[in-house]
């Protein structure tokens, strides 16, 4: 379940959801609920949260020390995969299993395309290393780990500038002794400078490909997520927020900042999962058992099923295939993650498409007469409408009208507003010009 507690008198809980376009803040406590929406800051996502803390202090007169917990949903993990901005990653595996990551499963997204190429592995073959060791299916050691070989690999990792390592050995889900020893050797040889992800820590389950892929995804996003949550925790304390930081997981629960830094693969659907949990709660309040949760974001749209009052869940998920897909749609086009997820399908909201209205019709190729463009996260959700401005659910959402008096906020064609909803309930806008 979502982290939830009742704040004490003059105590508050701060909830933060960072999306690709907007950051939403909710402050709850002392009998009140306040909200804030602001543009996300992709150069440093934590900046939007810290700015919210400043506004809480300045606008509401609330001391940051009164915030006793921060609950955070984030898209940092999934964006790192989708944008291919993860760490330079290596894989250490049992001799003979170097290519499991590339061979994958039989599934492919297109059945009759002879030109289809599988997605490039997150770890290229030259960075996949084999070690001499072997465990039986019962966990008994059949061949001792060659520690000298591991030390040689550590030297290669240093030469190659590797930032993160996934370790996945055969049958380590039964006996993790060799994986843990490799982790110790890497820590000693590399001085703790390389992020290490052990499959026995992340997914101690049978099935080599799924376990390897999950460990590799964890390693690939590990340094990025670790640095982010550690920086956010430190900077929150510097602003006076002493309460713990809780991070939303893909299954709808929360984990500590330290756990999130060690197991970031659990955060891939952090933000969308929170929305589904909220939808299920609202549906129960309305007496509805079976509903569809739909979340229109600035950069992606998400949908999930709520059945018999509970979000549908899965342990089979795929990320990085252009979209993140639910278990019913997994076809092998992305990177497998076998962890608990709320069963969410996610698609991109579009690219730099233009929409506008001319004298007679709705036009989708843009133009001078009332243009709306999809903007990236750094530009925010600018919406430009012929005759008036309307805040919308996402970058590409557009409401086209003719009479400015019907909506107010009349502006000349070719001008838009980046809307911000403040804690005091007012709206202010920053003028954007074409």
Regions found by a protein language model. Name each.
Residues 2-357, 366, 373, 379:
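N-terminally biased helix-coil "hinge/interface" segments that flank
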Residues 64, 86, 161, 392, ...:
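Generic low-complexity, intrinsically disordered sequence content enriched
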Residues 355-364, 368, 372-382, 392-393, ...:
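Short linear motifs in low-complexity or flexible loops
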Residues 385:
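Acidic, glycine-rich loop-and-strand cores that form catalytic or ligand-binding grooves
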Residues 395-399, 410-434:
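Polybasic, low-complexity intrinsically disordered segments
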